[in-house]
């Protein structure tokens, strides 16, 4: 994994995300910063991560989300071998329930 992906622009975006306080604020920011296609892609990746984390078979995830198995496999790879962001958020959401 390339270590040079994080720069001051990425950090600035992360800081912007950290000031959002509500779901509506987050939705408004995401809609302003992303095209509808980008937003749909992000939301599908997130749903794929949730389903894979829950143990749903990849083919079923792909079918349910109308995504390719390649996309689901890529999400699963990042879930298991990425920076830990998916897992961190999933665990925090589980702890809130």
List each language-model region with its residue ranges.
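Short acidic alpha-helix initiation/capping motifs at coil-to-helix transition points
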Residues: 4-9, 40, 52-53
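Short, amphipathic alpha-helical "recognition" segments used to contact nucleic acids or chromatin
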Residues: 42-56
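Amphipathic alpha-helical interaction elements
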Residues: 18, 22, 50-53, 77-81
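Short, Lys/Arg-enriched anionic-surface-contact patches
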Residues: 25-44, 97
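Short alpha-helical "recognition helix" segments of helix-turn-helix
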Residues: 60-65
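A general alpha-helix detector
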Residues: 9-13, 29, 47, 71
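General nucleic-acid-binding
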Residues: 1-20
């Amino acid at each position: 994994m390339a270590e040079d992906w994080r720069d001051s622009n990425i950090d600035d975006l992360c800081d912007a995300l950290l000031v959002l306080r509500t779901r509506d604020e987050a939705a408004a920011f995401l809609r302003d910063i992303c095209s509808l296609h980008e937003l749909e892609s992000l939301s599908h990746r997130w749903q794929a991560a949730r389903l894979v984390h829950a143990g749903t078979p990849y083919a079923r995830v792909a079918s349910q989300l109308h995504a390719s198995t390649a996309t689901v496999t890529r999400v699963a790879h990042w879930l298991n071998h990425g920076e830990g962001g998916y897992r961190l958020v999933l665990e925090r959401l589980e702890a809130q329930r």
